[in-house]
Amino acid sequence: MSETRTLQFESPRALQSLYANDIKLLKNLEDSLGVKVTTREGWVKLEGDSNRVDKAQHVFEQLEKARQQGVDIQKHEFNYALKAVSEEGDENLGDVVSTKISTSSRKPPIVARSANQRAYVEAIQKHDVVFGIGPAGTGKTYLAVAMAVAALKKEQVARIILTRPAVEAGEALGFLPGDLEQKITPYLRPLYDALREMLEPEEMERALSRQTIEVAPLAYMRGRTLNNAFVILDEAQNTTTEQMFMLLTRIGLNSKCVVTGDVTQIDLPANKRSGVVEALQALKNVPGIATVYFTERDVVRHELVRAIIGAYQQHRSPAPASRK
């Protein structure tokens, strides 16, 4: 049954803030839900099939609730609310983005941008070992680094240790030209990039020089006990089973460890089993350890990245067997 419904908002400015004053976002809503949207002054008119109008109204209600909670609604927030309603998810936009991580008094807090990101932050708060597993661009490493910096600022830990396997060099760094820093920097640059977004340049330089923040390849963790530290292992899908066991057994007193990886992007030789795959199976029932899985819905890079990941997943999935 076709229906026309008008929603009234407190002011034209309040209404415009719900779609970032970008009429293209309303066109996205029309195309996604199959409704006609007309907006003037402080009202919006929805026309279409009743259940589709219900969904469109729910999108605006989600956005309005988030606005009243102080959320600055931009393109990502609008599209997230639209996608959640389109897929009949139960995420509340305002609740999701209320999860904030403060890393610097001079930089805005980092905000969770999906339900899984929120669950990930909460898991890190509550557990000493957390696995964050999913595709690129879902914020696994970025949020882990933010939580580590926040913990350091609050003096909950004395240092941050960021590590990843230099699988491209087979971790045989001694064969590469240059001093240690020159050898390892290319493999660790994504971790440095995350730090630069959260710390002032002088603050980051001071922390690195004092080794309050240490960025090192996984091979350099062997034989150490990592006390009073926030440890992040990035690109964990490229650890061997021996390397993963080695790192997890380095964790000392008053320490946290976050392990991030994408099990669809394993670059190890065919005869090597990924350490993170084994760990996920072996540790799934161990108290104090949590695992959060991300999907393409959590991608916060360019909007095309989500579509690219989905297309590749569909392309790589085995075709159903034909019936004879």
Positions of predicted regions on the chain:
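Proteins enriched for Cys/Gly/acidic motifs involved in redox and nucleic-acid/cofactor modification
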Residues: L82-R113, Q125
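Short amphipathic alpha-helix segments
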Residues: A14-D31
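Short glycine-/aliphatic-rich beta-strand segments at the starts of folded cytosolic domains
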Residues: M1-Q16
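Flexible glycine-/small-residue-rich
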Residues: F9-S11, T39-E41, G48, R164, ...
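Conserved helicase motor core of SF1/SF2 NTP-dependent helicases
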Residues: S105-A115, A123-L233, Q237-K324
